[in-house]
Amino acid sequence: MNFVATFYTHLSALRTARALEGAGVQAELAPVPRALSSSCGTCVRYSAEDPLLERMDADTEAVYRREGDGYVCLLRNE
């Protein structure tokens, strides 16, 4: 499955990408898709069997699963 995680800070996005790569998941930093919002404008895109929420940094804004042309929110930190 394909996932997108958004963050409140660029550092949090970088930490999460490194944590996912440490778990053997290919992850990339990218601009946040227009359909989603983010405080810092940077997201992490990754593919995995599950969303690996335990690998997210503390400043994660939300995690979405890609479904067709849209996204399903799996986690939102307000």
Residue ranges and their predicted role:
Residues 1-53:
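Amphipathic, hydrophobic secondary-structure cores in small proteins
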Residues 45-78:
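C-terminal structural segments of small proteins and small subunits
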